[in-house]
Amino acid sequence: MESDLIDLFEGAKKAADAAALDGVTSSGPEVSQCIDALKQLKKFPVTYDTLVATQVGKKLRSLAKHPVEDIKSVATDLLEIWKKVVIEETAKAKKTEGTNGCKEAKVNKMDVEKPSNPAPVKVQKLQRGDSAKSIKVERKEPDNKVVTGVKIERKVPDIKVTNGTKIDYRGQAVKDEKVSKDNQSSMKAPAKAANAPPKLTAMLKCNDPVRDKIRELLVEALCRVAGEADDYERESVNASDPLRVAVSVESLMFEKLGRSTGAQKLKYRSIMFNLRDSNNPDLRRRVLTGEISPEKLITLSAEDMASDKRKQENNQIKEKALFDCERGLAAKASTDQFKCGRCGQRKCTYYQMQTRSADEPMTTYVTCVNCDNHWKFC
């Protein structure tokens, strides 16, 4: 089931990428193929566990920002459907847990039939010391049989208090065992995972005003992730510690890049700007959850730290610039009729231009594909 879901989504993703590269606006085979795959995903039965295991929900957000409006609208509808599934299953799970916690053990009641003619019962008390007392019970059955039994009752020994010390009936002191508050709290607290460090309650300072300010800015940026995360990301975000991550990032930046006022000032500014950018929630979330480690963060370029939306816009700008650049060049054709004088190969491209008067032959410009040798002739 998970593999089928991944295959369907990968097909839609490839078609959407092809449509974005080709610059298709609303029609085309890639757009139709992507929309058909997304409609199949709408009918595909998914659960919260399936979405978490395959992580297709995170990848679907890029299609919800696609430049083609048809793909964008269908992907947005599919994302809303999956969000409803996650919310409903989470609510059911919480309701089930609450029901199980409040459920009390049921006691089966047995009906007792009262005898119509109760038989007379004789009770005789027999004393046996101070600590116990026996009672002789005689009951006469309807068939004139007498049933005799002995019931023993024990007295609860009295405990006397003398000068703050409790003394039982045997004259021995009774010790009160008290549980300290620390032990009580440790007994009540649930056991934490051994490999998960506890969350910091306050930011660790290093007695350097500049470094402490950078840590405060990082904590402020990472704490915003909790309000930006989706429902299926909230569990991993809540398990992360923004204070500890901020301290780790700043410490590694200081260790590898030096002070923020030194030679790596621009690198500091680039990292801080992208982490605090309101349009770049993806980078903050990946750093907080550990998808991007502090070691990897300081090696990323400004383009790598950009948001998914910004990366897509940059790719479109590059494609358009490359297309505009090549549009002004002369059209070239491939041929094997020319032999390169440098490498002897016949893999060449050529184009012709009118460089002299109209009644003169055109000038042919040839380029060797193998060694990039250029020559011309008339």
Swiss-Prot record:
Domain called TFIIS central: residue spans: 210-333
TFIIS-type ZnF: 336-376
A molecular function (GO) term: zinc ion binding
Domain TFIIS N-terminal: 10-89
Disulfide bonds: none
SUPFAM superfamilies attached to this UniProt entry: Conserved domain common to transcription factors TFIIS, elongin A, CRSP70, Elongation factor TFIIS domain 2, Zinc beta-ribbon
Tissue: Expressed in roots, leaves and flowers.
CDD domains the UniProt entry points to: TFIIS_I, Zn-ribbon_TFIIS
GO CC term (a single one): nucleus
Deletion consequences: Reduced seed dormancy and increased germination rate of freshly harvested seeds. Early flowering.
GO biological process, one term: seed dormancy process
Modified residue annotations for N-acetylmethionine: 1
SMART domains assigned to the protein according to its UniProt record, in alphabetical order: TFS2M (SM00510), TFS2N (SM00509), ZnF_C2C2 (SM00440)
Keywords: Acetylation, Elongation factor, Metal-binding, Nucleus, Protein biosynthesis, Zinc, Zinc-finger
Keyword Lyase attached: no
Residues where Zn(2+) binds: 340, 343, 368, 371
Subcellular location: Nucleus
Pfam families found in the cross-reference section: Med26, TFIIS_M, Zn_ribbon_TFIIS
Main location: nucleus
Record function comment: Necessary for efficient RNA polymerase II transcription elongation past template-encoded arresting sites. Involved in the control of seed dormancy and germination.
PANTHER family: IP08861P-RELATED, TRANSCRIPTION FACTOR S-II ZINC FINGER DOMAIN-CONTAINING PROTEIN
Protein name per UniProt: Transcription elongation factor TFIIS
Naturally occurring in which organism (per UniProt): Arabidopsis thaliana (Mouse-ear cress)
